[in-house]
């Protein structure tokens, strides 16, 4: 497993994809419900990785602290699980949710943290983890991988709006994806046109529930009573770190770019865990 320290979490209260183009485009992109949900989840992951998990690791060195380590790990799992649920709620295509998001503003993240710390609410929140089977189905249409302006692989959403490029010294495949001979600069510029950004975010918002379900239903996080001590602390810590790693890659897909998470992005996409279509082999 890749050490958690190798994950490059953002250093700010409002993380933006490093490939997000101009500030105006980035702000418009950030206001979309789905991307906002991913950013809040990414902030939670950043805080969890930088503060809670290092404490767990240090305390876990002492053999007489197994009970305390297990409790802290379970609290971390509950917090991360509640963050996933919060992301699902924020991404729902509801006008009421959109208006609520505008009015609540920065208070939303604090409310999400309060829900995570309140053990009494976790039973109700956990019911959202088991989604109806149609929510797990991916769209039948996909657009193949393209390149960003820094020449790193990224996943193009199936709903991305094709842009009418010039025909000089360029090629395109059947799905309308720019060919490799095209200028990387032009690909980057047009990938962040407003209509393309909004279409990608809408498509990714539709896939959010499936992505979250893939993490949680695969038992990467311990689900159940926090007082249950059947799972050894070592195995519990491995599951939690795996969930954080998977969530980091999900955030990368959400931003439609591999935002510094390393080479495992390609491995996860190859396994079709979060892909919007068939795996690229």
From Swiss-Prot:
Superkingdom to which the source organism belongs: Viruses
Question: Record keywords: NADP included?
Answer: no
| Keyword NAD on entry | no
User: Which residues lie in coiled coils?
Assistant: none
Recite the UniProt keywords alphabetically. Answer: Host nucleus, Late protein, Virion, Virion tegument
The family this protein is said to belong to: Belongs to the herpesviridae US10 family.
Q: What is this protein called?
A: Virion protein US10 homolog
From which source organism is this entry? Psittacid herpesvirus 1 (isolate Amazon parrot/-/97-0001/1997) (PsHV-1)
The encoding gene = US10
């Amino acid at each position: 497993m890749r050490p958690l320290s190798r994950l490059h979490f953002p250093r700010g209260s409002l993380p933006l994809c490093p490939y997000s183009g101009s500030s105006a485009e980035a702000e418009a992109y950030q206001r979309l419900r789905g991307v906002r949900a991913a950013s809040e989840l990414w902030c939670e992951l950043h805080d969890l990785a930088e503060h809670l998990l290092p404490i767990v690791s240090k305390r876990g060195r002492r053999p007489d602290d197994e009970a305390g380590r297990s409790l802290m790990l379970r609290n971390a799992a509950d917090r991360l699980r509640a963050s996933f649920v919060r992301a699902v709620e924020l991404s729902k295509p509801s006008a009421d949710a959109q208006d609520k998001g505008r009015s609540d503003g920065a208070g939303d993240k604090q409310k999400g943290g309060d829900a995570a710390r309140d053990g009494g609410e976790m039973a109700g929140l956990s019911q959202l983890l088991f989604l109806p089977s149609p929510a797990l189905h991916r769209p039948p249409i996909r657009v193949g991988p393209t390149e960003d302006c820094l020449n790193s692989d990224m996943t193009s959403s199936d709903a991305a709006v094709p842009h009418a490029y010039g025909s000089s010294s360029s090629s395109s495949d059947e799905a309308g994806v720019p060919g490799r001979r095209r200028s990387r600069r032009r690909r980057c510029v047009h990938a962040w046109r407003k209509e393309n950004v909004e279409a990608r975010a809408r498509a990714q918002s539709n896939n959010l529930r499936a992505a979250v379900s893939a993490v949680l239903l695969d038992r990467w996080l311990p689900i159940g009573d926090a007082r249950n001590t059947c799972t050894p602390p070592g195995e519990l810590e491995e599951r939690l770190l795996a969930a954080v790693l998977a969530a980091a890659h999900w955030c990368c897909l959400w931003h439609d770019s591999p935002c510094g998470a390393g080479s495992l992005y390609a491995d996860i996409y190859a396994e079709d865990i979060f892909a919007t279509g068939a795996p690229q082999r």
